[in-house]
């Protein structure tokens, strides 16, 4: 199975769980997205890797149109249903990959993405597409899990992420994001950094992680160096904290 198909399969079967996930449905970053879009009258917004639609739902009341874009058709069906339930008539869905955006040049005032890019097969190509479909003077806000600055910490969190979700590619560090945006012709900065508390049981259940992999994650945490356990604040039940960041670019 190719990676794009793997992502679509993994998240198509878990769409309902992501809609009700408190980790995804809440957060101060959603308010930041909404306030940012509200500053641009009649904005047309692209939400890349929209997941169950929480970022789209947050910005839709402040936008002229929101295109919720995802590789998994079942995710998009979930977004359609939830948008209808919320009375958000200016959201439309579109299926596709981040690396091949099916839109005309200079189409969007804002391009946003929340907790998606760590699954993208080719981030440089995706950012080139973002540059192409963004209007002159348009803006970008990306939110994602961040890789750790120290190699010891980074190796462990990438391993944990991959064990939990075989479609995971990489949680990029802040400096990597700046370099990626710079290479795509953007001027980017880290707008915010924070930590997310991960409740282990619901985290693996949401992704339907097979039990042998759950056991492997627990073993990795329990056998990791003290520095790793302390940094990620690993609890006895396997719960821990992840780094997150918001990148602003234009």
Give names to the regions the model predicted.
Residues 170-184:
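Short alpha-helix
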Residues 1-40, 54-58, 74-78, 82, 141-163, ...:
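Conserved class I S-adenosyl-L-methionine
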Residues 109-122:
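A short SAM/SAH-binding and catalytic strip from SAM-dependent methyltransferases
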Residues 187-250:
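Conserved Class I S-adenosyl-L-methionine
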Residues 99-110:
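A short acidic, Gly/Pro-enriched loop at the edge of an enzyme's catalytic core
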């Amino acid at each position: 199975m190719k990676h794009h198909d793997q992502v679509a399969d993994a998240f198509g079967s878990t769409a309902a769980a992501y809609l009700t996930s408190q980790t995804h449905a809440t957060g101060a970053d959603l308010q930041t997205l909404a306030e940012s879009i509200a500053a641009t009258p009649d904005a047309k917004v692209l939400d890349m890797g929209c997941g169950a639609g929480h970022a789209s739902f947050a910005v839709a009341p402040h936008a002229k149109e929101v295109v919720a874009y995802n590789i998994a058709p079942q995710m998009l069906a979930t977004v359609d249903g939830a948008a209808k339930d919320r009375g958000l008539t200016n959201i439309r869905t579109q299926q596709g990959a981040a690396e091949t955006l099916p839109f005309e040049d200079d189409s969007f005032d804002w391009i946003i993405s929340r907790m998606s890019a760590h699954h993208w097969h080719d981030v440089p190509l995706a950012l080139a597409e973002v540059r192409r479909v963004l209007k002159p003077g348009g803006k970008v806000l990306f939110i994602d899990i961040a890789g750790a600055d120290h190699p010891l910490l980074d190796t462990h969190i990438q391993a944990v992420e991959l064990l939990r979700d075989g479609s995971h590619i990489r949680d990029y560090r802040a400096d990597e994001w700046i370099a990626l945006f710079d290479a795509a012709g953007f001027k980017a900065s880290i707008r915010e950094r924070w930590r997310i508390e991960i409740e282990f049981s619901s985290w693996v259940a949401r992704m339907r992680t097979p039990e042998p992999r759950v056991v492997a994650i627990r073993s990795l945490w329990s056998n990791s160096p003290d520095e790793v356990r302390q940094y990620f604040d690993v609890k006895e039940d396997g719960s821990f904290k992840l780094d997150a960041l918001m990148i602003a670019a234009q």
